[in-house]
């Protein structure tokens, strides 16, 4: 577990950020493994999810995460807060130079802006809002099979990659049939597929397909928006008590041991640090199997066959 030397900084609106010593920040950042991708790049296994945080509230959240040691942030045009993220990156110096090189920035194309020309135009706007010269990963947000334009859009993504404005190309919410269609049209597998994944919705067929084709799996809603903390009639809580950690840390550790990239969301500095602090314990084989056994038939979020983040 990490030892912290802290002092508190209060932002307008009541958000309190705890400032941590440089030594502790470096230790937290260094503790997070990198996951090797099929394009030769490597992504920090833990990032900060930024869904459902207003643009005027997101900057101190990002600043707090960076101060806690996060080196991976996950945004999207559809979250409507890229401007606030950009303000945080600029305020902390993570928009340029060595600090920028140390940070993995992901954003996603809005579904309504799919298409070759519209995707290029959208990226220009998004990079401007983020106040960065390049993005580490640009992603298709939903497959929208009812209005499929992923192949055409991917060609725009490749152009951005060739120009050095994007390093890695990924997708979100793609099922095997969508991944195969994209590959048929472009000759490429994405580096990452970001999907809803947590103990009660493990998507084993999707995960197996991704592993077979060298696609890294990234989990959003890694705790089912908190619903899985009490899953299995107290299974998670009992494991947490055994290790003297929180139920959230147990679930996140399960993901880590599965080799999954995770982007837990928290607006609280203490919980942000807690979500990084996953490397002072390990699950036993029996504990890991008990969490595996919690898999169920119901997703917490949207259906990739019907949903669009317009």
Predicted regions and their residues:
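A short, structured active-site edge motif that brings together acidic residues
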Residues: 99-113, 136-143, 197
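Beta/alpha (TIM)-barrel catalytic core signal, keyed to glycine-rich beta->alpha loops juxtaposed to Asp/Glu
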Residues: 143-310
